[in-house]
Amino acid sequence: ILIDSNMQLHQSIPIISFGDTNVLNITYERNPGAAFSILEGKQLFLILFTAVVIVVMLYLMLSKRVKKPTYIWSMSLIVAGGIGNLIDRVIRGEVVDFIDVRIINFAVFNVADICAVLGALGLLLFVVADEIKEQKNKRSAKKSTAAGEIEKSTNEDK
């Protein structure tokens, strides 16, 4: 609300500069699609998809099907980002983006995008880390079982 009521579309206000380079700007943009404007014009699909993701994640968290705090935190960030962008899509028909980092030539984005991306990355990292731990534990258990069987057969041979 602050951005679209106080700025003109495409207007940019430098926040952090180094020399002649504006590193961080508040730039008012509207995005009728998803990330990088993909699925532009597919508002109904984006609204329904986002709503389904939010409902599924809330169900998984509230029904206690997901118990690990790291998963819950990650999913909460995804839900928060989804709700933020969903509100924009329903009210405005598009998402208001305003964070413009120019040290890398990157798309303008918003706080909801940050939440969704950090949540998705966190969930991915935690799931992969847990899978690696589980595989290591299975290998250790196999080695322990195999060592125990060797010791048992050695003792039986005596």
Could you tell me what each predicted segment is?
Residues 1-158:
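Alpha-helical transmembrane bundles and membrane-interface segments of multipass inner-membrane proteins
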